[in-house]
From Swiss-Prot:
The gene is IN26. Homodimer and heterodimers. It comes from Ipomoea nil (Japanese morning glory). Residues 48-75, 144-163 are extracellular. It is found in: Cell membrane. Keywords: Cell membrane, Membrane, Transmembrane, Transmembrane helix. Disulfide bonds: none annotated. This is CASP-like protein IN26.
Amino acid sequence: VAPTGSVETEKAGPSYKPKEYYKVTEAILRLLLLASLVVAVVVMVTSKETELISVKLDPFPPFMLPLTAKFTQSPAFIYFVAGLSVAGLYTIISTLASFYNLLIKPGFCPALVSHFIILDVVMLGIVGTATGAAGGVAYIGLKGNSHVGWTKVCNKYGKLCTHLGASLAVSFFAFIVLLLLIILSIHSLSKKIPK
């Protein structure tokens, strides 16, 4: 015979409130953003290759000359490293603030979320423009431009171009993560607006 009255059931696993899900998701996304920014910068900075290139000076016969290609030879790649480094520094600070808000000072802080939204949008612009600028230069290196006489270089510097492509792909991933963070922050802030 089952006793009458209320019976408490135990839930499997911890129970999280919706705002805790937001905080945990935000912290995970910020860590993912930081990791992707660091990887993109490190891969770009380590992109350096030396190849023997045939050089012809009239009236002399062609000769082989060792030429080095590296990221510092293009202002777009320098901007890429600088922009992603700034975004990485901001991400370190915002990740620490997220963990502080998650672990030490629980509770929803609309002021912190609104500051994150504004600064995340600024960082989205920086990461987007840096990725676009570097991507444009990398594309010219890959395909060249016959109309203005720019020859492609990726057929000679394959390792360098592989590094550039990988760095740009990871940077684009960081751009998407940053966009998701902005959407998540706006959604969580909109839930606090009285209806």
